[in-house]
C-alpha cells in the first residue's frame, strides 16, 4: 500500500473514532424522577442506564435493584 493510501486510511479511521460515541455516558439523562422503591427480590439488575429502557422509562436504582420505571414529575 502506498504511503498516500495508508495516510488516507489512518485519517478515515481517526475520523470514525472521533464520531463514534464511546458509551451511553455521552447521552443526557431522561427527564423526570424515579418513583418510590418497588417491592422486589434483592439485587435485580434489569438495566444499566436510561437508554437501555424503552420509550420514556428511566433506569432507576434502589440499592442493588436497577429497573426500568415510568418517571414521575414534580412541580
UniProtKB/Swiss-Prot annotation:
**Keywords on record:** Antibiotic, Antimicrobial, Disulfide bond, Secreted, Signal
Q: Name one GO molecular function term.
A: serine-type endopeptidase inhibitor activity
The WAP domain is annotated at 27-72
Principal localization reads secreted
Q: Which PANTHER family match?
A: ANTILEUKOPROTEINASE, WHEY ACDIC PROTEIN WAP
Task: State its role.
Answer: Damages membranes of susceptible bacteria. Has no hemolytic activity. Not toxic to mice. Does not inhibit the proteinases elastase and cathepsin G.
Would you tell me the protein name for this molecule? Veswaprin-c
User: Which organism was this protein described from?
Assistant: Demansia vestigiata
